[in-house]
């Protein structure tokens, strides 16, 4: 595996490749990330991964400085997955001058849910993903359903900007107790880690309520928020949306069997966790 930080060197290395499968990450790789590499291999060859902690998608009071950076361990994991190139640029490589041009998602997708609680987050994501796509020029890129809203936004962005990249969605990987794998799980104390699976269990109860025929979605959401709050969580939202566009469904759409998803974000202690479950 070649480890490259220069954009020009990356382009030189990938020249002539027309079936590249790309997996962008921020590093601190776990089994969830590695499953993305394996899925990428099913859709293209060679597989290119990137590791870049993107300052643009962190707010002023978020964890950019303490976000775990484990490059050497990540390199060893990617080598075992037979990744062809790891693109690991420095901030100077990616942003040699101030990034004045930004890619901003539409308000209906970018300013709801995560976008409401993390202003500017998806503009940072779309900007860096677009720039990475321009550097790698993949045929396929793999994104996890764990970041469901991000997946929807990137997919729509590629469609509307006519980027010649197929976006492949990967299922969320979970620990045996149901907790979705996340680099931020390492922030949890022992007691918090024991409590953390309750987030996925809460989503399962929401799903079951909808599948059992309950139609007052707002009441289901309020019940879930109250349940988490009573257990010491600080929920930002529990929200049932249409999978297609993350719009809140109407009663008629629910009855018609529109595919739904329930999404949540909540703090446990100082750690903010997100999760979702398709219904």
Curated annotation (Swiss-Prot):
Keyword Transcription regulation: no
Name assigned to this protein: Pantothenate synthetase
Additional observations: The reaction proceeds by a bi uni uni bi ping pong mechanism.
NCBIfam families to which the protein is assigned, alphabetical: cyt_tran_rel (TIGR00125), panC (TIGR00018)
Gene: panC
Family: Belongs to the pantothenate synthetase family.
Residues forming the catalytic site: 33
Cell compartments where the protein resides: Cytoplasm
InterPro entries: Cyt_trans-like, Pantoate_ligase, Pantoate_ligase_C, Rossmann-like_a/b/a_fold
